[in-house]
Amino acid sequence: MRQTKTGILLANLGTPDAPTPEAVKRYLKQFLSDRRVVDTSRLLWWPLLRGVILPLRSPRVAKLYASVWMEGGSPLMVYSRQQQQALAQRLPDMPVALGMSYGSPSLESAVDELLAEHVDHIVVLPLYPQYSCSTVGAVWDELARILARKRSIPGISFIRDYADNHDYINALANSVRASFAKHGEPDLLLLSYHGIPQRYADEGDDYPQRCRTTTRELASALGMAPEKVMMTYQSRFGREPWLMPYTDETLKMLGEKGVGHIQVMCPGFAADCLETLEEIAEQNREVFLGAGGKKYEYIPALNAAPEHIEMMASLVAAYR
């Protein structure tokens, strides 16, 4: 019997190809057109998106991307490629492809890349530690659309999330310990997760429960008292209520209350990107210090750290 050949598909959100208004507009149009992301009536949403949001937001967001752009591209792309290459070295018998839900390389190009390697089984690892319909669900939807056009489809193993995975929690804990050793233990460790509309959670998305699971497990691994660890949500968009408490408002409140030293980690981001490097490391630092805080550090994402790659390898190797 022929041995099954397994490939790995690493999936993430995506990024503009360049820090320009035109590239950002293309990216945002694709991203904000996905019903998993914005499920507003198309009759209402299309005119607002095309006539107001894209023209106004694209130039402003392009400037933000330019402030964090790296020699090899956007931070998300640079770190995602590093993850892909490191995982391929760690598992040399399993081809590894990278695909993005929006922008390039697309998920379809990643599937085609693996099929060209004659794999008959694909392990799909969305790099979102905590499941949400707007992230992991979007990967599932696009993968189904891609495979619906194939005459022959490979076996698929789909990793829903890894919010309480032991290796993931340990990697986070070691990163926090290293930051404490470098900067001193703060008054508070703030864990900031990307937000989603509260309505999505009310309708069954268990994302907030998965975030709470990671927070609980990480605090336990660190041996920190509950009052020394706080969980918030960032990056809200639009007018409807999102998961609370909001990161920026919380940091302002903490600064005003006299909390002097805070360190912030974003456990839901497998790779640093605009939302971590600009929003958290820069914008929210200014919010906290401007409200009276004294010391603020951002703890980087795991990116391509060896422990992170080992965690990925252990996750996917179970599905060989």
Swiss-Prot record:
Q: Output one GO MF annotation.
A: ferrochelatase activity
Please state what class of enzyme this protein is. lyase
* Keyword annotations: Cytoplasm, Heme biosynthesis, Iron, Lyase, Metal-binding, Porphyrin biosynthesis
Q: Where this protein primarily resides, as one coarse class?
A: cytoplasm
Give its localization.
Cytoplasm
Recorded hits in CDD domains, A to Z, give: Ferrochelatase_C, Ferrochelatase_N
Q: What EC number(s) is this enzyme filed under?
A: 4.98.1.1
Enumerate the Gene Ontology biological process terms. heme biosynthetic process
Q: Which InterPro entries match?
A: Ferrochelatase, Ferrochelatase_AS, Ferrochelatase_C, Ferrochelatase_N
Report the Gene3D superfamilies cross-referenced here: 3.40.50.1400
Q: What Gene Ontology cellular component terms go with this record?
A: cytoplasm
In which pathway does this enzyme or protein participate? Porphyrin-containing compound metabolism; protoheme biosynthesis; protoheme from protoporphyrin-IX: step 1/1
Q: Which domain of life is it from?
A: Bacteria
Specify which residues bind Fe cation according to the UniProt entry for this protein.
Answer: 194, 275
Question: Catalysed reaction per UniProt?
Answer: heme b + 2 H(+) = protoporphyrin IX + Fe(2+)
Q: How does it assemble?
A: Monomer.
Tell me the protein family, please: Belongs to the ferrochelatase family.
Relate the protein's function as given in its record.
Catalyzes the ferrous insertion into protoporphyrin IX.
Stated name of the protein: Ferrochelatase
Instruction: Give the organism, scientific name.
Output: Escherichia fergusonii (strain ATCC 35469 / DSM 13698 / CCUG 18766 / IAM 14443 / JCM 21226 / LMG 7866 / NBRC 102419 / NCTC 12128 / CDC 0568-73)
Q: Give the gene symbol.
A: hemH
